[in-house]
Amino acid sequence: MNTVRVAFLLVFVLAVSLGQADKDENRMEMQEKTEQGKSYLDFAENLLLQKLEELEAKLLEEDSEESRNSRQKRCIGEGVPCDENDPRCCSGLVCLKPTLHGIWYKSYYCYKKRSA
Protein backbone atom coordinates (compact mmCIF):
# COMPACT_ATOMS: atom_id res chain seq x y z
CA MET A 1 0.00 0.00 0.00
CA ASN A 2 2.90 2.31 0.62
CA THR A 3 4.16 1.73 -2.90
CA VAL A 4 0.77 2.72 -4.28
CA ARG A 5 0.85 5.91 -2.22
CA VAL A 6 4.41 6.67 -3.29
CA ALA A 7 3.54 6.03 -6.95
CA PHE A 8 0.43 8.18 -6.68
CA LEU A 9 2.39 10.94 -4.93
CA LEU A 10 5.09 10.76 -7.60
CA VAL A 11 2.53 11.01 -10.42
CA PHE A 12 0.81 13.89 -8.62
CA VAL A 13 4.06 15.84 -8.18
CA LEU A 14 5.00 15.31 -11.83
CA ALA A 15 1.57 16.40 -13.01
CA VAL A 16 1.66 19.55 -10.92
CA SER A 17 5.19 20.51 -11.97
CA LEU A 18 4.57 19.81 -15.67
CA GLY A 19 1.20 21.52 -15.50
CA GLN A 20 2.82 24.61 -14.04
CA ALA A 21 5.37 24.65 -16.85
CA ASP A 22 2.59 24.31 -19.40
CA LYS A 23 0.74 27.18 -17.75
CA ASP A 24 3.77 29.47 -18.05
CA GLU A 25 4.31 28.33 -21.61
CA ASN A 26 0.66 28.96 -22.46
CA ARG A 27 0.89 32.43 -20.94
CA MET A 28 3.92 33.22 -23.11
CA GLU A 29 2.15 31.89 -26.22
CA MET A 30 -0.88 34.06 -25.48
CA GLN A 31 1.32 37.14 -25.12
CA GLU A 32 2.99 36.40 -28.45
CA LYS A 33 -0.37 35.91 -30.15
CA THR A 34 -1.74 39.18 -28.78
CA GLU A 35 1.38 41.00 -29.96
CA GLN A 36 0.98 39.43 -33.40
CA GLY A 37 -2.70 40.35 -33.37
CA LYS A 38 -1.80 43.95 -32.62
CA SER A 39 0.67 44.00 -35.50
CA TYR A 40 -2.00 42.51 -37.79
CA LEU A 41 -4.46 45.15 -36.64
CA ASP A 42 -1.92 47.90 -37.29
CA PHE A 43 -1.24 46.48 -40.74
CA ALA A 44 -4.95 46.25 -41.54
CA GLU A 45 -5.51 49.78 -40.24
CA ASN A 46 -2.72 51.17 -42.44
CA LEU A 47 -4.05 49.29 -45.47
CA LEU A 48 -7.55 50.64 -44.89
CA LEU A 49 -6.18 54.15 -44.47
CA GLN A 50 -4.32 53.89 -47.80
CA LYS A 51 -7.45 52.69 -49.58
CA LEU A 52 -9.51 55.54 -48.11
CA GLU A 53 -6.89 58.10 -49.17
CA GLU A 54 -6.90 56.69 -52.73
CA LEU A 55 -10.70 56.83 -52.83
CA GLU A 56 -10.70 60.40 -51.55
CA ALA A 57 -8.15 61.43 -54.18
CA LYS A 58 -10.29 59.88 -56.94
CA LEU A 59 -13.41 61.65 -55.68
CA LEU A 60 -11.65 65.01 -55.51
CA GLU A 61 -10.27 64.46 -59.01
CA GLU A 62 -13.76 63.72 -60.37
CA ASP A 63 -15.14 66.86 -58.71
CA SER A 64 -12.46 69.02 -60.32
CA GLU A 65 -13.15 67.45 -63.74
CA GLU A 66 -16.88 68.11 -63.39
CA SER A 67 -16.32 71.75 -62.49
CA ARG A 68 -13.92 72.13 -65.43
CA ASN A 69 -16.36 70.61 -67.91
CA SER A 70 -19.56 72.14 -66.61
CA ARG A 71 -20.62 75.38 -68.21
CA GLN A 72 -22.21 78.19 -66.29
CA LYS A 73 -25.54 79.30 -67.73
CA ARG A 74 -25.28 82.78 -69.14
CA CYS A 75 -28.88 83.64 -69.87
CA ILE A 76 -32.38 83.02 -68.55
CA GLY A 77 -35.02 81.29 -70.67
CA GLU A 78 -38.59 82.30 -71.42
CA GLY A 79 -41.05 82.36 -68.53
CA VAL A 80 -38.31 82.34 -65.91
CA PRO A 81 -38.12 85.02 -63.17
CA CYS A 82 -35.49 87.67 -63.78
CA ASP A 83 -34.16 90.72 -61.97
CA GLU A 84 -35.48 94.06 -63.22
CA ASN A 85 -32.18 95.82 -62.55
CA ASP A 86 -29.94 93.05 -63.89
CA PRO A 87 -31.80 91.19 -66.66
CA ARG A 88 -30.00 88.13 -67.98
CA CYS A 89 -32.65 87.02 -70.42
CA CYS A 90 -31.48 85.18 -73.52
CA SER A 91 -31.42 86.95 -76.89
CA GLY A 92 -34.90 87.60 -78.21
CA LEU A 93 -36.32 87.88 -74.68
CA VAL A 94 -37.06 90.91 -72.50
CA CYS A 95 -37.46 91.16 -68.71
CA LEU A 96 -41.03 92.44 -68.17
CA LYS A 97 -43.58 92.62 -65.39
CA PRO A 98 -46.18 89.86 -65.90
CA THR A 99 -49.63 90.70 -67.21
CA LEU A 100 -53.01 89.22 -66.27
CA HIS A 101 -52.47 85.81 -64.70
CA GLY A 102 -48.99 86.78 -63.49
CA ILE A 103 -49.99 89.95 -61.63
CA TRP A 104 -50.15 88.03 -58.37
CA TYR A 105 -46.39 87.58 -58.42
CA LYS A 106 -44.10 90.44 -57.43
CA SER A 107 -41.41 89.48 -59.88
CA TYR A 108 -40.36 90.13 -63.44
CA TYR A 109 -40.17 87.36 -66.04
CA CYS A 110 -38.38 86.87 -69.34
CA TYR A 111 -40.83 87.16 -72.28
CA LYS A 112 -40.42 87.18 -76.05
CA LYS A 113 -40.02 90.61 -77.60
CA ARG A 114 -43.19 91.86 -79.23
CA SER A 115 -42.79 93.06 -82.75
CA ALA A 116 -44.84 96.21 -83.19
Curated annotation (Swiss-Prot):
Transmembrane segments: none annotated. Residues 61-83 are annotated as: Disordered. Residues 22-74 form a propeptide. Keywords: Disulfide bond, Ion channel impairing toxin, Knottin, Secreted, Signal, Toxin. Expressed by the venom gland. Residues 1-21 form the signal peptide. Probable ion channel inhibitor. This is U11-theraphotoxin-Hhn1b.
